[in-house]
A protein has these predicted regions:
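The feature marks helicase ATPase cores and/or their adjacent C-terminal helical subdomains
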Residues: 1-229
């Protein structure tokens, strides 16, 4: 009954069925903004006995104070749902379902359902990601903003993320700067991202990088984008 309800939620939110035969646990992949959190929140309202775990827990429903639970051991309870499961390879065989974003993290399994539709990334960022990663993301957001800037002339706006190659330099200038993998499961409406060479960065770390042009190696390059949350 619980699994049937979860499948109805996935289909209602336009998640597509793959050719992989259904098995346990159910594996669901969706990019950021595809509706994973909405599905998890709705499911939890109907079946609160099924805990929702994550390696980086977030607040699912502020009005009802519904939090994800943190995975603190290598053992996950029977019937649990795990969000961002691919953050760490564990034995998830007793879980009801696994949710993850295959663009952000390794350890991904073959999915039973997936969605490449996003309400978060606007047309500009979507075009950028499709070009970089050879994807087919469909943007449902009305508008976004993407700017390339001189890192030595323009201050960052919003939240600051830096690739490993320039992280030490940027974090000294901008306290609170995070590495890409430290932002898994988090949402920001405005982000400044720094790297030395984004296309080179994508080749080396394809699951934790975005896009860029080709500045001099070792010199940080800065771009900013605004998106829906």
């Amino acid at each position: 009954m619980e699994l049937a309800y979860l499948v109805r939620l996935l289909e209602h939110n336009k998640f597509e069925r793959t050719n992989l035969p259904l098995s346990s646990p159910l594996v669901v992949h969706g990019i950021a903004g595809s509706g994973k959190s909405t599905i998890l929140t709705t499911f939890h309202h109907h079946y609160p006995a099924h805990p929702i775990f994550s390696h980086s827990p977030t607040l699912l429903d502020p009005s009802n104070r519904i939090y994800q639970q943190c995975i603190t051991t290598d053992s996950v309870p029977d019937g649990a749902i795990v969000d961002e499961y691919n953050y760490k390879a564990l034995d998830y065989s007793r879980c009801l379902a696994l949710f993850g974003d295959p663009l952000q993290l390794p350890h991904s399994l073959q999915p039973h359902y997936y969605s490449s539709r996003t309400h978060r990334y606007g047309p500009k960022l979507t075009s950028l990601l499709n070009d970089l990663f050879h994807l087919s993301i469909t943007s449902l957001a009305p508008v976004d903003s993407l700017d390339y800037a001189d890192p030595f002339a323009v201050d960052p706006s919003g939240f600051t993320i830096a690739d490993e190659e320039v992280y030490n330099f940027v974090s000294q200038q901008v306290p609170g700067t995070l590495l890409p993998l430290d932002t898994v499961g988090l949402e920001y409406s405005s982000v400044s991202f720094y790297c030395s060479d984004l296309r080179h960065c994508v080749v080396l770390r394809p699951l934790s990088s975005l896009h860029g042009s080709h500045p001099r190696q070792g010199q940080p390059h800065h771009f900013r984008f605004l998106c829906q949350v």
